[in-house]
């Protein structure tokens, strides 16, 4: 095709090699307003399309952007494992990729846009061991850039791994085994106040790797502390600039027809001025008056009263004809704008926050363990009005989650689920399958805890952790981290270190001509909505285990980010102190939890342990009540909630692996496994049976005549026997021992 255009660039990782990024347009999906094919080293291939509705969406007071990621099984040379052999609902990995794309993309569109915009990223091909999420951010940005929509991109997204002290861009799965930290950053190029181009960080998603603890404590790797994270974000800026330049080069080769959809502001200037006159002075009295009052969570009710009175007055103005009827829908937005201005000004000028706290104050903390009977572990963590219940369930490793997606990871033994019922905010709403937000929050909490989990060898259990958000007013995800630490310890999980999390906020603005940045610790839901940043940080007392940053600013100065990380560390240590006062070491495992024992057998003995059609292993499970799973390397996991069942199963497994070879004269308490007209077959040890002839059975009843051996012995009955003879073929002849 003659009109195909492309642009490519090289990401230089020094001694770790290079990665080639290529964007192409004009060949595929030509009906979409914007479509781009993105390549990573020529083998991983994504198609991103951006489409826009022709008319504004009716009765919509928000920007209707939808981001979807379509994973195709053929991309990895697979056929779907479902009944219909067709892709179904998106995988968790695809949903998380959608969130990674949406978070930097959404604030880059013009405010007031009401036309539906849909971005679909389809994974067409993926090389083994590759991740596609960071490439998808760039592909979505590029297709939106060439669509002609009002968009302040391009946006560059890069994934970095800290390996041997170097930040490596676009790492492969195999690289992460030697990495301490995994960091995904998105940003865009903007012109700063000095007129120079700079990189605005818009989104950060990061975690310590599963191998981080061993690398740090056994191999001397650098701890991912606050300073190291800052270095990583700064390193990302170089790669983001390169990725943005490639996208801009592609756009410069096209004759773009810019689409200018109508913009619908949330409120008119006249409505804003009227509402401001009604409420501003009263709101200032409320929030400036909080300066000396200390923490007062009920102070927000005063602003609710002000809002209701203002609405009544505005409604009267509509009835009098000063404003038209449609203006009523503008009131909530205008009120929020005035409230936002008042709250931000109060903070910037040194007054108290919305609830009366100081800038670095944490809301009252409370924690308790063992709150739910019969479960394996449970805890409640409360911070202000945010309350989270954590519940832990343990099981055998065969219950670990099997992952059927394009991700290189095929299974995981730690599963974290997060639930956000509508009553947590005092509302009525739908319940059912988890929404994207719930999946994202659960995954963030999961990543915060994975680095401190014991190894499979030290703790051979699958772990399911559930976080129930019972009350929400700011950062239930970080509350989930704290509740989970308590719950896991209560369940007897030997965590390498306790983990706590905190959400930080930021207010920025000019005061007397000077630009000020004020960091807020432990932000409430309102401060999250009215502020400039949502910065969640989780970690141990030594290093950061997970981090998530979203900002509405063009960029966060390095010193502001450094200050936020320092305040987050102080808050994290304070919360950890509360957690360790409640529980500082693993409790005894619950009597209801399975006890899992690990036994190692030679690989060549696996078939013997399983037996023909599973006969041997099933007989052990039936007889002992224990569950048994066998790994390919000969590791056998035996689990039961009753210790004697596990011990009996271990003994039976060992008798197969290291069998006691029957010899003439040896005695066994055997089990009748089959009755025949000529006698009974007795199982001596797993895999070794002998024949107790009917003539010997008659001796057990003083020689009387038997119509059937069933008159004396039944299947499953225990009988003491002695080996009397072993023939040339190894067959065992038995006699009963009185």
UniProtKB/Swiss-Prot annotation:
CDD domains: KH-I_PNPase (cd02393), RNase_PH_PNPase_2 (cd11364)
Span of domain S1 motif: 665-737
Catalytic activity: RNA(n+1) + phosphate = RNA(n) + a ribonucleoside 5'-diphosphate
GO biological process, one term: mRNA catabolic process
Record carries keyword Transferase: yes
Main location: cytoplasm
One example GO MF annotation: RNA binding
PROSITE patterns reported in the protein's UniProt record: KH_TYPE_1, S1
Compartments in which it is found: Cytoplasm
GO cellular component terms listed in the entry, alphabetical order: cytosol
Domain KH: 594-653
Similarity field: Belongs to the polyribonucleotide nucleotidyltransferase family.
Function comment: Involved in mRNA degradation. Catalyzes the phosphorolysis of single-stranded polyribonucleotides processively in the 3'- to 5'-direction.
Protein name: Polyribonucleotide nucleotidyltransferase
Gene: pnp
